[in-house]
């Protein structure tokens, strides 16, 4: 179709005035300048249709050039105008068939303004002697009276009868005939309306043309007789003689076939006779009897094709004819026209706003390149409240493809949904195969751009949206859009959590409802697992989540508002979220402060990966104790989660896959991580959830936790990301992992490779143990991983999830990204070994390594170069492994590890690096079977971290971050923190406990925690617990931003399992003595129950545990006050105090670090006071506090000896003692009361005033395990003092206990804060400092503050921490069954020694432990 302009001048014979208006109802412009008059026509092959000038405001363009698409029609129109009067105008010119080969004949409809200003029309027959003739003659004049009738003759033409005259016209094409019929019907309608009849005063000007008939006789005869021109179509061949017996059935078939033919054929080049012939060919029968029916149907179809189709309220899809129908366009409110053709011109340039896409409907056409422009044009029309017509020639291929592309981008639909939607409204829609391929490519581009957009969003805002989506495209995770949708749908079907948006990205394990998990796992279907990197939910995160959901055809808006998950992916996330968890998230989310949001933005993005159901199944299977999280039994859920911890991440993909995934994740994470570090709480606080292939029931538990996490909008988006990082979903990263991620940023790929190589030696064991550990640890691990920016690793392997996250932290920086890439693969292969190496290489990875015995030490070797630190860390890990049960190794490892743990804890808090704990678990498993207890500690730590993550201001996260950096620095950013860490780390390596100023003197054997401290020197005695039962969150202020988001992460870990995925405490052990529950490994942690600090210390424990040898079988002691379901525990900041690293070894490690620890902790305590900026922030531990801590450490040592067969386990740092344990026990009672008081206060207060300190202390890390919400922990003090025993229980209760512990911790902290003198105040750093932190024993107020801070963070994330605790109770029984049988007896003393070797040991020991862990992975035992 083309637009041609014809110049015309009045003929000399004309006597009409120059101003006489042309016949066209005033549509023609006045001929004030006759010589410059031009007319515009819409031309197709064989026809020209006059185009009115609209409002006449624009002068028609004057072009003397011939339109290449008009053929000779433009020339013929020019010749025809010579025969017309100046006042007359051509309405239509249609080329007709002729009996003479070289003769060209046109039926011309001419109109003019009549006597009463009405339009009068006649039909003229014009003859051209030859096709190229420039002159024409007139052979027919036929006035159109009111009695005019038009009939189709069935042979490609129509007859016009009027005043007893009948003339037959046979246009050269169907399109030309359609144009003629339209014009004739309009003219006849006007004639009937005004009753034009022969002899009246109308059409008197016909005589002028009748007197000018000048064609030769043969032409005149053709016009008059017409019989010989009819060119009847010959009869059909004898072949087609069978007439269908059922006429009705035949007509239906004719309708269908006819529409197909007319849609496929170029109607400009085919006649109705040819269409009927084609129809007969396809139907294999003679349709002569149906020719009338066929003609009528043809007209109906043409009419349908001629009217534009309304696809959306503001979008019409049509053909060139629709674009040429001015009246119809104006009636429909169209002001914008998108012309997707090269051959069709813009018909009304002065009336409509046009945008042209000059392309042909060909296979080679690249239409995709224009879709961004077309989207903007259509959006512009929508923005201005107008409507847009998108047209090509037929409205079938080019324009339809463009509208489909618009729908995909505007509404986030997938190709199938958009295509079906458009096809349903315009049945003729049929993009050519090339356009369909381009639409598929565009779908991928939109998906990738969403991910990039989200990443950018997260990197520039509080949200972790960016990484969430990017993982979807991770090579490691080969999930296409449909697969992702399917996974999400499966999860949604299995279990839908309605309040996904409400739930902050607290550590919520991926808990696909058990049914769903079992279904998906057993059916080997793909299940979505969420991997959350952020502690807080942000609009951006939600948006990202929604976007991912949109990928599945749901509008992002639908999920955004309520995370109801209208989208497929959203539903998946929802399914992952536990209904019980959802409310908690919702409650916490409202409490998120701007600070929290900022922190979240700084944190590593939340990652959600879809893990193939097969992988999930196997990993879940690996989780021995992971019951259906969906099941009502809280203990069952908790146990399942614990089991997940124990076996979490053992099942890795190939090292190569892991490496690839890590590399990708590292890149994405490096940006978010560095940004997070810069912002302060620079730790990548992304806790990444990895999907581990576990038994279906275990998977369900994990999914529940995951669901808890995904209950928040953040979870939702993570759910999508998790699809990419499906493997990492089940993994829980411990706070240490978060720290590791930060240091990891500085790690180089080379370092990672080196670590991988070192780890590869124990790969076999690690993988086996890793699977086992990763499954038990799975849930907590997930959270941690979730936080980690690194997502590709988690996707490939759930266990490596934390590990990967550590690497992803590395990837935060480009170089780190590469390094992490290396680490991730090796992590994927060897969770335990890799974790250790990563800790060494990448301090940020430390959290992940925390799971490993010495993994934490190397987490943050930022002091020097990442590589240097990594090497040193590996060395120390190896030493730690060697000195598995030696306390002397503890201090060195603790220092190194502490720094790393600190950073890991910080990372975990900010990044939900529960995964970190998982690597630790893996590591511990490697080190020894007894290390399973440590694994639990690690899990506990991860749980604590989860808690921190949950609460945007969770002290645990803050603590971790503070450990990584000074409180202020932590806030500043990961980079500054890393630098400080490097300096501090060097110092801390010697004195890891220093990170916990308050706990420094205590020097509890919590190497992992200590490492966290080392990681962030700024974090001072987070875990310090003083008799006052308070926690000093020196890091609270610093970590508030990051930690708030990261708190969520620590929730994941349950005390039932070590962070090494080992059950820290056996049921009998738990029952025996809450204080002893920590086992030698959790000596400090035992103190923790007395104070929310234990929770804070849980991360510290985690850090310590990794440092401590695996041999310590100290049960994983989390202070989980209430038995909530596993998933809830993850959802809520666990009150479980994971005395990770509180093993003999931990104690020994602490002892090593004791001198440094004291000084370091003192300094840290100051940091806590200043950094946390909390009311209850305590100055560095006083001598009294240190002594208290030491006593606790001794007590823990005794407990460890009793609980842990290994000498190292029995070994307790000088800071931990039975006396301390007893003190913790006693303070537990006091704290318990306080906890009750504070618990109520905490419930009503969303945020902790002392979040920073809590976060900064190891207690904060432990608090991460507490199910503390910002809402629940109005005061760190509340958390600390209220539930010391709850804290103890929490380690055992992954979900339930975690929740209760959180509640208990919140009140405990408040009470602790009030009771500044209470011993509950051992800080998490203290815990870290001493591997054996007695969680139940209050040491000092700082710890409470830390706990409060942790609780605050959690509250920020989980406004209803207490409700979450309650929800967690369902899962608690499971956890209790595993390791919390003792929870009831001494709720405050539940200690989850994470047995993270060398947590307090130097990096060297950590490295050694890491290596050991890799090799010792098989030793992981779930007690």
Curated annotation (Swiss-Prot):
EC number, as in UniProt = 3.1.3.16, 3.1.3.48
Q: What GO molecular function terms would the record report?
A: actin binding; protein serine/threonine phosphatase activity; protein tyrosine phosphatase activity
Q: Does the keyword Transmembrane helix apply?
A: no
Q: Which domain of life is it from?
A: Eukaryota
Q: Which InterPro entries match?
A: DEK_C, Dual-sp_phosphatase_cat-dom, Phosphatase_SSH-like, Prot-tyrosine_phosphatase-like, SSH-N, Tyr_Pase_AS, Tyr_Pase_dom, TYR_PHOSPHATASE_DUAL_dom
> Where does the Tyrosine-protein phosphatase domain lie?
307-448
**Where are the Phosphoserine modifications?**
17, 25, 36, 461, 487, 534, 631, 633, 1217
Tissues expressing the protein:
Expressed in brain, heart, liver, skeletal muscle, testis and thymus. Also expressed at lower levels in kidney, small intestine and spleen. Within testicular seminiferous tubules expressed in germ cells and spermatocytes, where it has a cytoplasmic localization, and round spermatids, where it concentrates in the acrosomal region next to the nucleus.
Q: Which sites are catalytic?
A: 392
Where does the record place the region Disordered?
Answer: 1-37, 51-70, 698-725, 833-858, 878-950, 967-991, 1021-1042, 1074-1105, 1207-1226
- Residue ranges annotated as compositionally biased, kind Polar residues, are 884-904
Instruction: Show the ranges annotated as biased composition (Basic and acidic residues).
Output: 910-932, 976-987, 1033-1042
Q: What happens when the gene is disrupted?
A: Complete male infertility but no effect on body weight or testis weight and size. Impaired spermatogenesis devoid of spermatid elongation (arrested at stage II-III), resulting in accumulation of round spermatids with malformed acrosomal structures. Spermatids and germ cells show increased levels of apoptosis via BCL2-caspase-3 pathway. Actin cytoskeleton disorganization and actin filament aggregation in spermatids and germ cells, along with increased levels of cofilin phosphorylation.
Q: Does the keyword DNA-binding apply?
A: no
Q: Which UniProt keywords apply?
A: Actin-binding, Cell junction, Cytoplasm, Cytoplasmic vesicle, Cytoskeleton, Differentiation, Hydrolase, Phosphoprotein, Protein phosphatase, Spermatogenesis
Catalytic reactions of this protein: O-phospho-L-tyrosyl-[protein] + H2O = L-tyrosyl-[protein] + phosphate; O-phospho-L-seryl-[protein] + H2O = L-seryl-[protein] + phosphate; O-phospho-L-threonyl-[protein] + H2O = L-threonyl-[protein] + phosphate
Residue ranges with Low complexity bias = 9-18
Question: Which PANTHER family does this UniProt record tie to the protein?
Answer: PROTEIN PHOSPHATASE SLINGSHOT HOMOLOG 2, SLINGSHOT PROTEIN PHOSPHATASE HOMOLOG
* Assigned protein family: Belongs to the protein-tyrosine phosphatase family.
Note the subunit structure.
Interacts with filamentous actin.
Q: What is this protein called?
A: Protein phosphatase Slingshot homolog 2
- Encoding gene, per UniProt annotation: Ssh2
């Amino acid at each position: 179709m083309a637009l041609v302009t014809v110049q015309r001048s009045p003929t000399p014979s004309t006597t009409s005035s120059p101003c006489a208006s042309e016949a066209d109802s005033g549509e023609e412009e006045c001929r004030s300048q006759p010589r410059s008059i031009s007319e515009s026509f819409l031309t197709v092959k064989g026809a020209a249709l006059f185009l009115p000038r609209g409002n006449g405001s624009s002068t028609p363009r004057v072009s003397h050039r011939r339109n290449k698409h008009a053929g000779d029609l433009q020339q013929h129109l020019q010749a025809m105008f010579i025969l017309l009067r100046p006042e007359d105008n051509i309405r239509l010119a249609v080329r007709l068939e002729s009996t003479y080969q070289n003769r060209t004949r046109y039926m011309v409809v001419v109109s003019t303004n009549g006597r009463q200003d009405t339009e009068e029309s006649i039909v003229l027959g014009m003859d051209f002697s030859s096709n190229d003739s420039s002159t024409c003659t007139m052979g027919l004049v036929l006035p159109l009276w009111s009695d005019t009738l038009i009939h189709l003759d069935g042979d490609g033409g129509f007859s016009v009868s009027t005043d007893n005259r009948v003339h037959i016209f046979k246009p050269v094409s169907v399109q030309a005939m359609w144009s003629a019929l339209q014009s004739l019907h309009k003219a006849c309608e006007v004639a009937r309306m005004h009753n034009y009849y022969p002899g009246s005063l109308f059409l008197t000007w016909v005589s002028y043309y009748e007197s000018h008939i000048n064609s030769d006789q043969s032409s005149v005869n053709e016009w008059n007789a017409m019989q010989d021109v009819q060119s009847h179509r010959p009869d059909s061949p004898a072949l087609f003689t069978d007439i269908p017996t059922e006429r009705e059935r035949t007509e239906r078939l004719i309708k269908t076939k006819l529409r197909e033919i007319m849609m496929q054929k170029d109607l400009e080049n085919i006649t109705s006779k040819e269409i009927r012939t084609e129809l007969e060919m396809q139907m294999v029968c003679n349709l002569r009897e149906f020719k009338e029916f066929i003609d009528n149907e043809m007209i109906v179809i043409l009419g349908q094709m001629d009217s534009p189709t309304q696809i959306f309220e503001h979008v019409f899809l049509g053909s060139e004819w629709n674009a040429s129908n001015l009246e119809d366009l104006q009636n429909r409110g169209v002001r914008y026209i998108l012309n997707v053709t090269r051959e069709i011109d813009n018909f009304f340039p002065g009336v409509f706003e046009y945008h042209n896409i000059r392309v042909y409907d060909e296979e080679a056409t690249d239409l995709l390149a224009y879709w961004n422009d077309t989207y903007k044009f259509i959006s512009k029309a929508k923005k201005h409240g107008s409507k847009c017509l998108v047209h090509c020639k037929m409205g079938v291929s080019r324009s339809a493809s463009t509208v489909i592309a618009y729908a995909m981008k505007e509404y986030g639909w997938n190709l199938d949904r958009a295509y079906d939607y458009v096809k349903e409204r315009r049945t003729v829609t049929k993009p050519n195969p090339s356009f369909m391929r381009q639409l598929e490519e565009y779908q991928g581009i939109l998906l990738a751009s969403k991910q990039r957009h989200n990443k950018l969003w997260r990197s520039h805002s509080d949200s972790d949206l960016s990484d969430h989506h990017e993982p979807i495209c991770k090579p490691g995770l080969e999930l296409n859009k449909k697969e992702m949708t399917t996974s999400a749908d499966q999860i949604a079907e299995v279990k839908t959590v309605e309040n996904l948006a409400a739930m902050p990205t607290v550590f919520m394990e991926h808990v696909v409802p058990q049914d769903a998990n079992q279904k998906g796992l057993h059916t080997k279907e793909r299940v979505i697992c969420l991997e959350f990197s952020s502690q807080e939910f942000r609009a951006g995160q939600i948006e990202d989540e929604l976007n991912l959901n949109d990928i599945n055809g749901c509008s992002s808006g639908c999920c955004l508002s309520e995370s109801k998950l209208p989208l497929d992916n959203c539903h998946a996330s929802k399914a992952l979220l536990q209904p019980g968890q959802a409310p908690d998230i919702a409650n916490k989310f409202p409490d998120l402060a701007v600070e929290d949001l900022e922190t979240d933005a700084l944190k590593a993005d939340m990652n959600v990966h879809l893990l193939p159901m097969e992988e999930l199944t196997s990993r879940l299977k690996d989780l021995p104790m992971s019951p259906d999280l969906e099941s009502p039994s809280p203990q069952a859920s908790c146990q399942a989660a614990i089991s997940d911890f124990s076996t979490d991440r053992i099942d890795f993909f190939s090292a190569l896959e892991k490496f690839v995934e890590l590399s990708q994740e590292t890149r994405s994470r490096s940006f978010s991580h560095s940004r997070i570090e810069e912002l302060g709480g620079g730790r990548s606080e992304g806790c990444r959830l990895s999907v581990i292939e576990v038994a279906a029931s275990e998977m369900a538990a994990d999914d529940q936790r995951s669901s808890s996490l995904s209950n928040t909008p953040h979870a939702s988006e993570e759910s999508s990301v998790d699809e990419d990082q499906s493997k990492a979903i089940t993994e829980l990263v411990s706070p240490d992992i978060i720290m590791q991620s930060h240091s990891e940023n500085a790690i180089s790929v080379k370092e990672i490779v080196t670590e991988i190589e070192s780890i590869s030696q124990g790969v076999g064991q690690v993988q086996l143990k890793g699977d086992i550990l990763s499954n038990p640890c799975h849930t907590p691990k997930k959270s941690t991983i979730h936080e980690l920016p690194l997502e590709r690793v988690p996707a490939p392997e759930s266990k490596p999830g934390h590990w990967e996250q550590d690497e992803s932290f590395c990837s935060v920086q480009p170089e780190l990204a590469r390094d992490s890439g290396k680490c991730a693969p090796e992590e994927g292969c060897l969770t335990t070994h890799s974790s250790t190496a990563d800790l060494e290489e990448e301090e940020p990875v430390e959290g992940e390594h925390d799971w490993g015995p010495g993994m934490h030490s190397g987490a943050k070797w930022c002091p020097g170069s990442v590589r240097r630190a990594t090497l040193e860390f590996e060395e120390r890990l190896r030493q730690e492994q060697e000195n598995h049960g030696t306390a002397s190794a503890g201090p060195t490892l603790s220092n190194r590890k502490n720094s790393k743990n600190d950073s890991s804890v910080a990372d975990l808090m900010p990044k939900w690096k529960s995964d970190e704990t998982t690597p630790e678990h893996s590591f511990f498993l490697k080190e020894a079977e007894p290390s399973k207890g440590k694994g639990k500690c690690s899990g506990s730590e991860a749980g604590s971290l989860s808690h921190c993550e949950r609460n945007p201001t969770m002290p645990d996260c803050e603590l971790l971050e503070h450990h990584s950096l000074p409180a202020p620095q932590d806030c500043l950013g990961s980079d500054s923190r890393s630098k400080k860490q490097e300096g501090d780390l060097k110092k801390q390596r010697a004195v890891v406990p220093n990170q916990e100023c308050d706990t420094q003197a205590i020097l509890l054997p919590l190497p992992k925690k200590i490492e966290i401290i080392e990681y962030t020197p700024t974090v001072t005695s987070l875990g310090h617990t003083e008799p006052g039962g308070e926690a000093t969150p020196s890091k609270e202020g610093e970590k508030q931003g990051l930690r708030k988001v990261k708190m969520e992460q620590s929730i994941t870990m349950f005390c039932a399992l070590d962070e090494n995925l080992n059950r820290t405490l056996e049921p009998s052990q738990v029952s025996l003595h809450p204080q002893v529950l920590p086992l030698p490994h959790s000596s400090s942690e035992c103190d923790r129950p007395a104070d929310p600090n234990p929770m804070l210390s849980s991360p510290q424990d985690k850090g310590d545990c990794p440092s401590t040898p695996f041999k310590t079988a100290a049960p994983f002691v989390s202070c989980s006050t209430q038995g909530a379901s596993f998933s809830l525990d993850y959802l809520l900041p666990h009150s479980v105090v994971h005395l990770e690293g509180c093993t003999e070894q931990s104690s020994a490690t602490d002892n090593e670090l004791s001198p440094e620890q004291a000084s370091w902790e003192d300094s840290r305590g100051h940091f806590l006071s200043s950094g946390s900026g909390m009311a209850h922030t305590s100055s560095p531990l006083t001598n009294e506090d240190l002594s208290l801590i030491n006593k606790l450490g001794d007590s823990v040592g005794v407990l460890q000896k009793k609980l842990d067969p290994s000498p190292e386990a029995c070994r307790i740092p000088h800071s931990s003692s039975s006396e301390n344990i007893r003190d913790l026990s006693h303070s537990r009672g006091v704290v318990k009361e306080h906890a009750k008081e504070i618990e109520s206060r905490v419930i009503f207060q969303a945020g902790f005033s002392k979040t920073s300190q809590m976060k900064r202390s190891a207690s904060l890390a432990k608090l991460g395990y507490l199910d503390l919400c910002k809402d629940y922990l109005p005061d760190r003090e509340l958390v600390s003092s209220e539930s010391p025993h709850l804290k103890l229980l929490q380690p055992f209760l992954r979900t339930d206990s975690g929740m209760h512990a959180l509640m208990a911790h919140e009140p405990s902290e408040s009470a602790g804060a009030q009771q500044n003198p209470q011993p509950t105040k051992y800080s998490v750093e203290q815990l870290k400092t001493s591997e054996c932190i007695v969680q139940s024993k209050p040491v000092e107020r700082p710890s409470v503050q830390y706990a409060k801070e942790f609780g605050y963070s959690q509250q920020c994330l989980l406004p209803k921490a207490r409700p979450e605790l309650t929800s967690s109770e369902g899962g608690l029984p499971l956890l209790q069954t595993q390791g919390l049988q003792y929870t009831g007896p001494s709720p405050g003393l539940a200690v989850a020694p994470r047995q993270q070797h060398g947590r307090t040991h130097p990096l060297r020991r950590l490295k050694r432990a890491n290596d050991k862990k890799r090799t010792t992975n098989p030793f992981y035992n779930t007690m």
